[in-house]
Amino acid sequence: MTAAPAAANNAAPAPKTPRRGVLAAYLALTKPRVIELLLVTTVPAMFLAQRGIPSPWLVLVTLAGGAMSAGSANALNCVADSDIDAVMDRTKKRPLVSYEVPRRSALVFGIVLGVVSFAVLALGANLLAAVLSLAAILFYVFVYTLVLKRRTSQNIVWGGAAGCMPVVIGWAAVTGSVEWPALVMFGVVFLWTPPHFWSLAMKYREDYARAGVPMLPVVATPRQVSARILVYSWATVACTLLLVPATSWVYVAFAVLAGAAFLIVAQRLHNSIRRGHAYNPMKLFHLSNSYLALLFVAIAVDSAVGLPSFVA
């Protein structure tokens, strides 16, 4: 971290934005909207592992443990990235930057959340789910946040592995093991992550450049970025079809139709940039959220209705 922002973070000037309540400020540290998307992938993974509807208690425990685990990683990320957040317009209202939560308190909060999440998953689900959850926290904080994010344009590619863990945790909570469908779902989220975040980074390119974060849109041309987005989008859709043997026609129909819409928008973004036309990467960003959510809802619906899978 640079010396100036670090020193500034120890001061306590009056924030320029209205203060939240204490609970709201700590909640904001956990990045609830990010947690929501992570949990959207957890429950369908549990449905597929059960090939039906799993125990409501197990679902509740896994969601609670998963939410606290993700919240822990996000809070610790806010601590490590407070210098970056202070100079980015998109993140300058976060609690540490606006001095609503002391840095030390945020650190303790993140650690406590992680410990509690491990205990909840270990006692309420199983040890494997708890260990995978802890591994995700450590990877996100120490590998992505402290190493990859500030050093390579491939930061989100490899660092995104932490965001793929909820599907594996959900599967492990039900089965006590990790099997090939869980790895396929991991692959889907892994390949989906670059198009999702690179489209956002295209919008906030100047923000990342000002903060010294080498996101791909900062170090590459828009055409190069959109070309890679297109490649990863195709790879994502192809990976979704690897789940066909474990599902029925319900999932396949959703996967094909939603995948086609995802690819069309990614292709349009690339075409607009290649032809020198005006473009809006946020269309792909917002669609990518809906695409992943619908895809995993399809997995849950397919598992709940109980139709025979293509490979029994």
Curated annotation (Swiss-Prot):
One of its GO terms (biological process) is heme O biosynthetic process. Pfam families: UbiA (PF01040). It is an enzyme of class 2 (transferase). Its EC number is 2.5.1.141. The chain crosses the membrane at residues 21-41, 53-73, 105-125, 127-147, 156-176, 182-202, 225-245, 246-266, 292-312. Gene3D superfamilies: UbiA prenyltransferase (1.10.357.140). It is a multi-pass membrane protein. GO terms for cellular component: plasma membrane. It is found in: Cell membrane. InterPro entries: Protohaem_IX_farnesylTrfase, UbiA_prenyltransferase, UbiA_prenylTrfase_CS, UbiA_sf. PROSITE patterns: UBIA. One of its GO terms (molecular function) is protoheme IX farnesyltransferase activity. It catalyses: heme b + (2E,6E)-farnesyl diphosphate + H2O = Fe(II)-heme o + diphosphate. Pathway: Porphyrin-containing compound metabolism; heme O biosynthesis; heme O from protoheme: step 1/1. CDD domains: PT_UbiA_Cox10. Keywords: Cell membrane, Heme biosynthesis, Membrane, Transferase, Transmembrane, Transmembrane helix. Converts heme B (protoheme IX) to heme O by substitution of the vinyl group on carbon 2 of heme B porphyrin ring with a hydroxyethyl farnesyl side group. Carbon 2 of the heme B porphyrin ring is defined according to the Fischer nomenclature. Belongs to the UbiA prenyltransferase family. Protoheme IX farnesyltransferase subfamily. This is Protoheme IX farnesyltransferase 1. It comes from Saccharopolyspora erythraea (strain ATCC 11635 / DSM 40517 / JCM 4748 / NBRC 13426 / NCIMB 8594 / NRRL 2338).
